[in-house]
Amino acid sequence: MKTKLLLSLLGLFLITACSKSADELIELSSENLKNEKTDQAIKDLETLLTKYPEDSLASKAQYKLASIHLNWKNDLTKGYTSLQNTVSHYGRSIQGTQAQKEIDQFPEYILNKAESLRKRKMVKEAVEHLMYMIEKYSQHELTPKSQYMLGDLYMNEFRDFPTAI
């Protein structure tokens, strides 16, 4: 009986000692980003949000998650969802306020990002961004510009004249 109790306490101690704090997880995610390990950085931030959702660093982690999805992974869907989560869970924080501004300006962001991707010869990603813009914001005032840019990409980058028209 004493052995079971001792083993249980030892196991609990090891689990507690091995788990990382919110500060450590934020630092790990930053290090992983510096080392271009974006998937591990995402896991670190998701762990922080799961284990410490009420921590003062949680809003920063949620916003940083959006930034990684949008800027490193070029994943508009996950990035937008992360921005929405930042607003819904941490709306009164600095990050929540900034996330709301970015949501409000998301169509402009998409168009600017598509132009940037094209200049960096990341044509496939630029096309994906423009298609997302056209599908999700069909009534937005910038959608015709997105359609024009998409046609221009097909015409000049892919030399696919039928698709461009």
Outline where the language-model segments fall:
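N-terminal secretory signal peptides that target proteins for export/translocation
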Residues: 1-2
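Acidic, polar-rich low-complexity tracts and alpha-helical solenoid repeat scaffolds
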Residues: 5-6, 15-165
